[in-house]
């Protein structure tokens, strides 16, 4: 069902589906709420789908995957000027991106054994997500782009369109990577799991015992092979270390160790990973190019800044091609 206010658009509430692992929202006290408001002006992403994010988090609340308890999503823009999603606040720490956790912050302050526990727990949470049955959860056709295309083809098509939307000048690395991704697409990309999209430590809320309290930030959600998230995960670890001239902190696994641990935890033999690391680099480079455009428009960087062409993501992507 839906809850409809006076002359308001339908508001989807958590009561619309099963109560789930977090309990029935109607029968228990809520924690302090937090709202995720869709950008109303120029933004990083070409489109947003808070209803899809609501659907995913609500469905996952019935599983062992840690997600914030969602309360409702509101599509009526008269309240806050844009659609918004309301969920319960989750206490914990978040690994920083700017400067990255590899350079300073609470992750570096942890003893090495605690850092190793954090790194392993974060990978376990992603494996747990990938192990969920998306058909049973009703999430097997979720994601951005043309729904008439199958999982991964839909995603490639979407990011090709996004690159056209983003690029204001020629970007040889992105163009070469996009061509490479289309020409080298593996034949076996039909293995569909729920892909978090922006799969990285910085999008997890970490409890004091270094367990994952919640997986957050689902703007890039889709369906696809497990390697879709794993490739992004590994590329971002490299981006936050080699890409910025820093070392991966002790306690974190090397690339090969991380792959082996993923296989051990999941029982899945990782394949075509180089392809998905290139695809991760392509997506990250497109996002950085968009960020550069937004920063120029806002006057934070000069109009002739080479940020869209020269940045850690694009540099690492060029090395992978």
What do the PLM-derived regions correspond to, one by one?
Residues 191-196, 201:
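Catalytic-loop of the protein kinase fold
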Residues 216-221:
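Activation of the activation-loop gatekeeper triad in protein kinase-fold domains
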